[in-house]
């Protein structure tokens, strides 16, 4: 008998050699029916995996992210099998699970159309009904190469040839179809109850623009058709909220072929941007941060010293000035370090909190660019805090509180992940353990639940990631808090302690918005372009019913401007209903409508974007009401 430790802390004894599915059945019949795989001692495995020793076991269902990945991965194989049944000459590349579903990259002499996707989806449903078993088998590397060459799959051959010579290569067979794959998978195709092919895009083989452009077919899968329908409705809503579409309609920003990945902000977009930055400055001033600004271009030697050259070079841009080599900064931290080093520091000076709205440049492949969400130039709201080791926990708690206050203002809920040491990192095991424990302790002290995200930390330290949940349930990773023992060592940072000796500070890196550009993109989609009054580019639109009120419109607008309210006037010779509809289309929070009666009574008629007609009131009362809404930053979605 062997001991199995379960997720809930309980232990059970089972016979040696039992499969994961058998263990699930011992726990409950309903669990065994829902099970898609398991995590055994930290490794994700399939249901047929045999257990031969004491271990920890967590059964995975579609409610678990890893469970979703298993089913999505199997769905990508079903897609590939359907394509090969219909078009045997098509060459297969890769087909992974992704956050919202799966895709498969294929090389075909023809273009896939929406009509062809329907045909492929129909064939996928046939394969699902057949409930074909997925069976794993392995071959030595040379045999695997020959096997794929015989199947005329050059992309698979290339992948195998990249593996070490002594590799054992795994494949999955489902009926007449075989694919190169490490797994895991569900036991049979019938588990993918509800599939949908969503779209087609171009993708360079291995993400390299010098390679052939393949066709990428995206899809998604669920266990229930009702869940698929809910997801498709969500996708329709997301399309309506697409920040690229709304950004154009509301005249907020544009992106041009002269600068792919470099957004142009229009006047109304700049109002939003400046409003967010002013709010950021106000919050940081109250939290005792000092704002700095550091250069965009710095000598290449600095990036060698910081470690960015070794760990981030592929994402950087470089230039020459005179005879020197320089880099355009991808991160702000080395600049903050130079400011810290500019003076002798005492323990009495710490914590030293430097905040910066720093413009950074990072190379992204053209296929990855996406509106404001994925760009090559953006403004990062960085702060770098230099603390003593004794102050780490207190300072991280203050940072978490600041981030929490920020997100509440916008009406966001969030969840937290703790990202641990990646493979490509620097520093000792001891430093990484100390930093990771420091973050865990801070999260425990503030009572925040969190998930561990293995291997996704920065190259210089572990981090806490804040994932915002928008009003239609999507999540966006924005804020981060990183604890860093490495940079202070590399740059020989110190402070004079109470004992008169030099000591090494610890560095905390953190962002709240993350990227201002991306945060604006998220807000556009979160609010569907209907920004709260305090953020809205135009807070009030004043309009007349006839030409007789034109001067009164100008008078009302002047008073609003004097009270720092953002206002536009509409005195066009158009019907008032048309003007109101247009203001609604532009998502202006308030409209002031002026006719003969309002002009005679020296008052105004107010209409709200949200509530409709509010009625007549004095201009003074309206200003008081609106200024209170703006000052309180009321942000109802």
UniProtKB/Swiss-Prot annotation:
Keyword tRNA-binding: yes
Cofactors that this protein relies on: Zn(2+)
Enzyme class: ligase
Protein's gene: thrS
Membrane spanning stretches: none
Homology family: Belongs to the class-II aminoacyl-tRNA synthetase family.
Subunit record text: Homodimer.
The record's free-text note on cofactor binding: Binds 1 zinc ion per subunit.
Binding site for Zn(2+): 333, 384, 509
Gene Ontology cellular-component annotations: cytoplasm
Superkingdom of origin organism: Bacteria
Location of the region described as Catalytic in the Swiss-Prot/TrEMBL record: 242-532
Any one GO MF annotation of this record: transferase activity
InterPro entries the UniProt entry points to: aa-tRNA-synt_IIb, aa-tRNA-synth_II, aa-tRNA-synth_II/BPL/LPL, Anticodon-bd, Anticodon-bd_dom_sf, Beta-grasp_dom_sf, TGS, TGS-like
Primary role: Catalyzes the attachment of threonine to tRNA(Thr) in a two-step reaction: L-threonine is first activated by ATP to form Thr-AMP and then transferred to the acceptor end of tRNA(Thr). Also edits incorrectly charged L-seryl-tRNA(Thr).
Reaction(s) catalysed by this chain's protein: tRNA(Thr) + L-threonine + ATP = L-threonyl-tRNA(Thr) + AMP + diphosphate + H(+)
UniProt-listed GO biological process terms: threonyl-tRNA aminoacylation
Record organism: Clostridium kluyveri (strain ATCC 8527 / DSM 555 / NBRC 12016 / NCIMB 10680 / K1)
Entry keywords, A to Z: Aminoacyl-tRNA synthetase, ATP-binding, Cytoplasm, Ligase, Metal-binding, Nucleotide-binding, Protein biosynthesis, RNA-binding, tRNA-binding, Zinc
Protein name (Swiss-Prot/TrEMBL): Threonine--tRNA ligase
UniProt keyword Zinc present: yes
SS bonds (residue pairs): none
């Amino acid at each position: 008998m062997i001991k199995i430790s379960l997720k809930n802390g309980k232990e059970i004894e089972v016979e040696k050699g039992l499969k994961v599915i058998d263990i699930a059945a011992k726990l409950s019949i309903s669990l065994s029916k829902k099970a898609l795989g398991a995590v055994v001692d930290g490794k994700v495995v399939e249901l047929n995996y045999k257990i031969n020793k004491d271990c920890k076991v967590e059964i995975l269902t579609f409610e678990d992210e890893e469970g979703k990945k298993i089913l999505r991965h199997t769905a990508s194989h079903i897609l590939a099998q359907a394509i090969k049944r219909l078009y045997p000459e098509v060459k297969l590349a890769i087909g992974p699970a992704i956050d919202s579903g799966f895709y498969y990259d294929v090389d075909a002499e023809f273009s896939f159309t929406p009509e062809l996707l329907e045909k492929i989806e129909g064939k996928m449903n046939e394969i699902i009904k057949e409930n074909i078993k997925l069976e794993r088998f392995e071959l030595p590397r040379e045999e695997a190469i020959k096997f794929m060459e015989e199947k005329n799959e050059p992309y698979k051959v290339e992948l195998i040839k990249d593996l070490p010579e002594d590799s054992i290569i795994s494949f999955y067979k489902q009926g007449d179809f075989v694919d190169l794959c490490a797994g895991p998978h569900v036991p049979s195709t019938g588990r993918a109850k509800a599939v949908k092919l969503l779209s087609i895009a171009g993708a360079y083989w291995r993400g390299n623009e010098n390679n052939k452009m393949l066709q990428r077919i995206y899809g998604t899968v669920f266990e229930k058709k009702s869940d698929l329908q809910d997801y498709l409705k969500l996708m329709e809503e997301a399309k309506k909220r697409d920040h690229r579409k709304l950004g154009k309609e509301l005249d907020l920003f544009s992106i041009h072929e002269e600068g792919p990945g470099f957004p142009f902000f229009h006047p109304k977009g700049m109002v939003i941007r400046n409003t967010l930055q002013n709010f950021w400055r106000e919050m940081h001033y109250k939290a005792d941060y000092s704002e700095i600004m550091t250069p965009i271009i710095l000598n290449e030697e600095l990036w060698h010293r910081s470690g960015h050259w070794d760990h981030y070079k592929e994402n950087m841009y470089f230039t020459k000035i005179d005879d020197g080599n320089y880099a355009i900064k991808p991160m702000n931290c080395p600049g903050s370090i130079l400011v810290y080093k500019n003076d002798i520091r005492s323990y009495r000076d710490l914590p030293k909190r430097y905040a910066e709205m720093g413009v950074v440049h990072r190379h992204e492949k053209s296929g990855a660019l996406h509106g404001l969400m994925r760009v090559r130039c953006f403004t990062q709201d960085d702060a770098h805090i230099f603390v003593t080791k004794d102050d780490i926990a207190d300072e991280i708690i203050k940072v978490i509180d600041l981030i929490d206050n920020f997100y509440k203002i916008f009406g966001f809920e969030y969840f937290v992940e703790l990202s641990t040491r990646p493979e490509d990192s620097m520093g000792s095991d001891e430093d990484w353990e100390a930093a990771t424990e420091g973050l865990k302790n801070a999260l425990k002290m503030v009572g925040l639940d969190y998930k561990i995200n293995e291997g996704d930390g920065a190259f210089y330290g572990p981090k806490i990631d804040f994932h915002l949940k928008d009003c239609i349930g999507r999540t966006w990773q924005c804020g981060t808090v990183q604890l860093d023992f490495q940079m202070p060592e590399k740059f020989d940072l110190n402070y004079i302690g109470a004992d008169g000796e030099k000591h090494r500070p610890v560095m905390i890196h953190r962002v709240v918005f993350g990227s201002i550009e991306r945060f604006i993109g998220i807000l556009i989609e979160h609010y569907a372009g209907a920004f709260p009054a305090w953020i809205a580019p135009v807070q009030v639109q004043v309009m007349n019913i006839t030409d007789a009120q034109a001067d009164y419109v100008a008078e009302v607008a002047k008073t609003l401007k004097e009270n720092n309210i953002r206002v536009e006037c509409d005195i066009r010779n158009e019907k008032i209903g048309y003007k109101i509809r247009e203001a609604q289309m532009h998502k202006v929070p308030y409209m002031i409508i002026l006719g003969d009666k309002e002009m005679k009574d020296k008052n105004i008629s107010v209409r709200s974007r949200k509530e409709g007609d509010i009625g007549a009131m004095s201009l003074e009362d309206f200003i008081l009401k609106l200024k209170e809404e703006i000052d309180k930053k009321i942000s109802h979605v």
